[in-house]
Amino acid sequence: MKNRKSGDAGMKYDPAQVRIHEAYTVAIRDLGVHGEGIGSVDGFTIFVPGALPGETVTAEITLLKKSYAVGELLSIEWESPFRVVPKCPVYENCGGCQLSHLTYEGQLDMKYRRVKDVIERIAGESGDLVKPVLPAAHPFAYRNKMAVPAGLVKGEAALGCYRQGSHDIIPVSSCAIQKEENNRLLQFARRFIEKYGISVYDEKTRKGSLRHVMGRVGDDGKVMVVLVTASETLPEEKRWIEGIQKELPEVISLWHNIQPKPGNTILGAKIRHLWGRETLTASLCGLQFEVSPYSFFQVHKEQAEILYEKALAYADLQGGETVIDAYCGTGTISLCLAKKAKRVIGIEIVKSAIEDAKKNAKKNHMENTEFYAADAGKLMPQLYRQGLVPDVIVMDPVRAGCSEEVLKATAGMNPKRIVYVSCNPATFARDAKILKSEGYEIKEIQPVDMFPQTMHVETVALMIRGKSK
């Protein structure tokens, strides 16, 4: 071990004296956005992946910057009572989960404090507005969608997960947060690739064929499989079909997708249906949805239902309201709202999502819905000029939050209630502050744990029009 220096022994460190490859004793006080422990040596911030709040650890400095350093966890001198042994054997290297070394109770507390912090610090509101996080009944084996990358590991074909912060493949045979049906698909694909010597894609040389194996599990346990290749043809296509039919009877739909472009986008524009049904049927809040390879659908159905039910409660619909669902996606929230509203207008800039929304509305006989493929920030003022006055506006934007145009249009339409669903507490807090300046006030914020074992937390919030608005 390198020379060990203690931050607890009364020594005062000038940040310039914290040296690369030196070991220091660090008291961990919090977790960062990626799940890393945050501590300091006399005011100089040290990030220590794998460390938990309340722990005292020894860490060797592996990266040194002017205002912070990153340390490798060498040993734990004082262990948190909330530390547990992760279920996943590759947890420390995989980038998929960040909190599996923390008890579920500890995860919920951390997420609650994270939401409360940004509401106080960014929105300038009281943390008392934040309710306790709604937990998942099953914090493992909850994901109904899997997309496993293929690649080379020491020259050999492999399926697995990406190493944290890179695209290096870590071979795995199962994932603790995936449904069992997806893990069986993963194990079959590993055996198949090895048995038939399937060519896998190498990102560095851009050669090889198989890039991803995707599985989607429906409510009834039936599975859709999508095999993604860089090549126009699927190596051993007939054997893939025969093998899946023989070994995976739960699979009812098989597709071949072609993605020749480098980058992080998994699915390409070209796709071939190989066998079985073209869609899966999934339900959400009593509604039926047809799920295609390209469709967005919530990967944790049970928690999505809890989230949507809370959003519906905040909307407080009595049957005569007009509702706008900005960022409506494939219409899942819109259709839930339509069960209790007089009229629902869904707006989404992605045309394919609007096509799915219209199909889903027809399937569920929701004739009081309208869907527009448009920029909500531009369409909403047009609708207002045409006489549309919404009682409620619901928004569920991407992680970047709402555009300025959507926030301005929302305030201009003057709805009684705004229901804001967010996958990023920080951008919600930013947008809430803007809406507050327009005369709206936050009544309540409900975090929901959609993705146990990870740093992600969803929130749904109710904002109402102030008396002076």
Give the positions of each predicted feature:
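Rossmann-like S-adenosyl-L-methionine
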Residues: 2-25, 33, 232-469
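Extended interfacial segments that mediate partner engagement and assembly in macromolecular machines
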Residues: 74-86, 92-200, 234
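A short, glycine/Asx- and small/polar-enriched loop/turn
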Residues: 140-144, 219-221, 455-456
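Short, aliphatic-rich beta-strand segments
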Residues: 215, 221-230, 288-292
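Terminal RNA-binding accessory module
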Residues: 1-90, 370, 378
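Short, solvent-exposed loop/turn elements at beta->coil junctions and helix N-caps
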Residues: 131-139, 203-204, 210-212, 447-450
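Short, acidic/hydrophobic/Gly-rich beta-strand patch recurrent on exposed beta strands
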Residues: 37-42, 160-163, 228, 357
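Short, conserved phosphate/pyrophosphate- and ester-handling motifs at nucleotide-, phospho-/glycolipid
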Residues: 54, 178, 300
